[in-house]
Amino acid sequence: MAMNKLNFLLLLAVCVSAFSVVMQQNQYRLNFTALDKAKKQEIALEQDYAQMRLQQARLANHEAIRAAAEKQNLHPPVSGNTFMVEHQR
């Protein structure tokens, strides 16, 4: 009778241990998947940031600004074209 109780306790301990191992492996897989997804998102964000920096550098180029101003027929303001707007209370 004592051997049956011992065998049952050992079987229970093995089952609990096996369940624990399965749960740990599952948690590891979930964490690894989340990490992989975060790394892919990081790479995509870095690519977007690099593209935005290139676009900013292109837009800040004085030659590009001058060309855009000429295309839109813009001219620097002169004193005859400017006027002051005052707020009356």
UniProtKB/Swiss-Prot annotation:
Query: So which stretches are on the Periplasmic side?
Result: 25-89
| Coiled-coil portions | 33-73
**UniProt entry keywords in alphabetical sequence:** Cell cycle, Cell division, Cell inner membrane, Cell membrane, Coiled coil, Membrane, Transmembrane, Transmembrane helix
Residues on Cytoplasmic side: 1-6
The GO cellular component terms are: cell division site; plasma membrane
* Membrane topology, from the record: Single-pass type II membrane protein
* One Pfam family, short name: FtsL
Q: Where in the cell is it found?
A: Cell inner membrane
Out of the domains of life, which is the source? Bacteria
Q: Does the keyword NADP apply?
A: no
Q: Which residues cross the membrane?
A: 7-24
Chain's role: Essential cell division protein. May link together the upstream cell division proteins, which are predominantly cytoplasmic, with the downstream cell division proteins, which are predominantly periplasmic.
Family assignment from sequence similarity: Belongs to the FtsL family.
NCBIfam families per UniProt: ftsL_broad
Q: What is this protein called?
A: Cell division protein FtsL
- The organism encoding this protein is Neisseria meningitidis serogroup B (strain ATCC BAA-335 / MC58)
> What gene is this protein a product of?
ftsL
